[in-house]
Amino acid sequence: MKFENIKGSIVAMITPFHEDGSVNFEVLTELLERQIAAGTDGILTLGTTGEYPTMSHEEDASVVEHTIKVVNGRVPVMVGSGSNCTATQLEKSIQYQDMGADALLLISPYYNKANPEGMYRHFAETADAVHIPCLLYNVPGRTGCSISVPVVEKLAKHPNIVGIKEASGDMSYAMKIAHCIGPDFALYSGNDDITIPLMSIGGSGVISVYANVMPGMCHQIVADYLGGNQAQAVANHLKYLKLMNDLFIEVNPIPVKSAMNMMGLNVGPMRLPLCEMSEEHQAVLRASLQEAGLL
């Protein structure tokens, strides 16, 4: 399915594991079917929430292959192919494109970082090498570097770079991006708690962690807001805002996987260095799930 600058809720999928740490493909199938049945508008696999940094390249490819096979064109599948090594990013991007991905999510180069020209070329050379749409991923809290507004503005002119997942949480930055991009460049919230503020400045929706827990509601909030029923969207957003925030009470994806296990979805453990939540935070999260009617 073509990725046509989707307006809606794209779930940032978790990767379920068995207790021995191997990928649980049976549960992954169940989770994908649950998302599609709930109306999710798109699937992102191998994002931050999918724990790709702790998986081998072979495991990454097996998750991509399985996801594309199960989804079977019912909604677009975006794959995180980013790396802090441009050559590695190129290799993965071409591989996932050839496997049938509909779009690619490219993170800014973490740890080694880059100057503005290096940042531009990191994304542009990858976009030059593939024919499926590419989205930028700005998450400076993880990478230690932000994609500057001038670099985003320049990259937005590339015919194969179609949007950005903005996960800095900085509304001033987001507004500057919204001001400099054209109507064909999509701005997605990468933070569930500010999805509505971003849509109010022209955002296309959210790439969501919360959608792992409440996929139908996440889809409905975005659909209502973009469809003109802003009052209902805001009411539901505020109703579940505490849960959205508590899904980040510890580093993602620890809370969301913990929540899904509490809900009986059997997604298994995280891989080290991620580990179980503190008892105090488990109690807070359980209370939020109960308040939301999920337990």
Label every model-predicted segment:
Residues 55-58, 91, 116-119, 147-149, ...:
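Short secondary-structure transition/capping segments
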Residues 5-16, 38-40, 49, 200-203, ...:
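C-terminal alpha-helical cap/extension of soluble enzyme domains
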Residues 38, 62, 66-70, 95, ...:
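Alpha-helical structural signal in soluble globular domains
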Residues 2-11, 17-146:
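Active-site beta->alpha loop and helix N-cap motifs at the rims of alpha/beta catalytic domains
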Residues 25, 32, 149, 282-289:
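Short, amphipathic alpha-helical "lid/cap" segments that border enzyme active or binding sites
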Residues 138, 160-161, 271-272:
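Glycine-rich phosphate-binding "P-loop"
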Residues 28, 60, 64, 89, ...:
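A general structural signal for well-ordered alpha-helical segments in protein cores
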Residues 128, 142-248:
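Catalytic alpha/beta core domains of metabolic enzymes, predominantly
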